[in-house]
Amino acid sequence: MLKKGQVTIFIILAIIIVAAILVYFLWVRPTYNFQEGGQLNFEGCVEDVIKESVEKLGMQGGFANPEFYYDYKTNSVAYLCYTNLYYRPCIRQVAFLSQKFEAELKKDTGAKIQSCYESSVRELRSKGFDVKDAEGNLEIDLSLGKINVLFSAPTSVSSDSGGSSFEDFDFSINSKIYRLLSIASSIVESEIHSGDGGIEILRLTYYDLNLEIERQEGGSKIYSIEDETTKE
């Protein structure tokens, strides 16, 4: 079983990334604030949705539903670099891994986060609040140390004692995924130019990580990346 924070890369006459990068969630910070009793509390739901999706995307090479993939156990793992010729470098299949992961994360979580929002609206209405809600627009940005989630949905909440209105829900979730995806991209680049001979250079570069390679039958290779400090 893969450990938290670990990235595994498979090469089956190709390079397949199974980035089992479990989000290192420390906190979620909503930027909205209502009077006591009138809050839209769905940050926990958003956290769960993002975490679940990151785990799934990680195990499928960064794709929610990959079309060009390798079946590994119960996962369909997308090829990120591929060749069907021995002794020839593989050809990169995904130009910008972090951006692709970001887009797939947005696509995979959009409807679920909308559902989180609607569930919170229903809860407020059940408590007697008058709520005007809207279809939300989701933006997700991966940055160093964070997953930034912006859910825009013009909403107003009112009761006999007053009301509030707002446009955006802004969440910031601590995560190592951006850095791990960047390192995975470096491994892909190394395979293209140097094969697995570049692993020693990468070990020196990322000295705080434990980088291992395991060769499989049929030309397969498994790379693993583990944080030396946290052992995740």
Regions found by a protein language model. Name each.
Residues 10-232:
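Long, compositionally biased, intrinsically disordered regions
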Residues 1-12:
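Glycine-centered recognition micro-motifs in short, flexible terminal segments and loops
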